[in-house]
Amino acid sequence: MKDLLQYAACFLAIFSTGFLIVATWTDCWMVNADDSLEVSTKCRGLWWECVTNAFDGIRTCDEYDSIYAEHPLKLVVTRALMITADILAGFGFITLLLGLDCVKFLPDDPQIKVRLCFVAGTTLLIAGTPGIIGSVWYAVDVYVERSSLVLHNIFLGIQYKFGWSCWLGMAGSLGCFLAGALLTCCLYLFKDVGPERNYPYAMRKPYSTAGVSMAKSYKAPRTETAKMYAVDTRV
C-alpha cells in the first residue's frame, strides 16, 4: 500500500508540475473572441498577447513591455505567484523522486526516505497555494471585467472567456494539493514500517529459542552425597 501511494503521488506530482509550468509560460489565460465578426481570436497571457486569424490561421504575437514597466496589478501578482508555484512544485517533485523506494538513494536508511517523502508532500502542498490563488484570482478578474462590460452595455460583441492556460494552472494546483496529501498521509500511516523496527525482535527470537534448548539439554552433575541419598531412598 505504501508503494502504491508513493507511485500515485509521483504520477500526480509530475503532471501537476508540468501543468503549472506550461500554464505560466503560455499565452492563453484569457480568450477574447469577437462573435459578431468571427475574424480573429485574441489570447492574452502573462507575458504576451497573440491574435490568430480565423481564415488563414496566421498567428501574430506581441510581447508586453519590460518587466520593469508599469503593468496591471493582476498581471504582476499572477506572474509572481505562478513562478513561485513552479519553483516549489519542481523542488517537491525532485525530492519525491529521491524518496521513492525504487530509487537507489540511501537504500540502507528507509527512515530518511520516509522523511524525504514527507518534505516533498509538504512542499507540494505549499506549491499548490500560490498556484491556485494566482489562477483563481486571474479567472475572477476576467469574469468581473466581462460582467462589468455587459452591465454597462459596452462592447457586447466581445466575449471574455477563460483560456486553457488558466484551467491548466487550476488543475496543476489541485494536483499538487492531492499529491501532497497522499505523501503526508503515507508518512503517518507507514512511519513504523521498516527493517530497523523489526530488527530487535528478530534478534531476540532466535536467542530465546537457543536459550531454551540449551536449558533443556543441560543437566547438572550429581555429587557423591546426592548419589548416596538416591541409593538410600531406593532401598
Swiss-Prot record:
Pfam families linked to this entry: PMP22_Claudin (PF00822)
Q: Where are the transmembrane segments?
A: 4-24, 80-100, 116-136, 170-190
**Extracellular topology ranges:** 25-79, 137-169
Recorded hits in InterPro entries, A to Z, give:
Claudin, Claudin16, Claudin_CS, PMP22/EMP/MP20/Claudin
Q: Where is this motif: Interaction with TJP1?
A: 233-235
Task: Tell me a GO cellular component.
Answer: tight junction
Gene Ontology molecular function, alphabetical:
identical protein binding; paracellular tight junction channel activity; PDZ domain binding; structural molecule activity
BP GO terms, sorted = calcium-independent cell-cell adhesion via plasma membrane cell-adhesion molecules; monoatomic ion transport; paracellular transport; renal absorption
Please report the record's description of how this protein sits within the membrane. Answer: Multi-pass membrane protein
How would you summarize where this protein is expressed among tissues? Answer: Expressed in the corticomedullary axis of the TAL, specifically in the cortex and the outer stripe of outer medulla (OSOM) zone (at protein level).
Q: Quote the subcellular location field of this record.
A: Cell junction, Tight junction; Cell membrane
Cytoplasmic side residue ranges read 1-3, 101-115, 191-235
Q: What catalytic reaction does the record list?
A: Mg(2+)(in) = Mg(2+)(out); Ca(2+)(in) = Ca(2+)(out); Na(+)(in) = Na(+)(out); K(+)(in) = K(+)(out)
Q: How does it assemble?
A: Can form heteropolymeric tight junction strands with other claudins. Interacts with CLDN19. Cannot form tight junction strands on its own. Interacts (via PDZ-binding motif TRV) with TJP1 (via PDZ domain).
Tell me which family the UniProt entry assigns to this protein: Belongs to the claudin family.
- Comment, domains: The first extracellular loop contains negatively charged amino acids that affect cation selectivity.
State what this protein does. Forms paracellular channels: coassembles with CLDN19 into tight junction strands with cation-selective channels through the strands, conveying epithelial permeability in a process known as paracellular tight junction permeability. Involved in the maintenance of ion gradients along the nephron. In the thick ascending limb (TAL) of Henle's loop, facilitates sodium paracellular permeability from the interstitial compartment to the lumen, contributing to the lumen-positive transepithelial potential that drives paracellular magnesium and calcium reabsorption.
Its protein name is Claudin-16
Q: Which organism is it from?
A: Mus musculus (Mouse)
High-level lineage: Eukaryota, Metazoa, Chordata, Craniata, Vertebrata
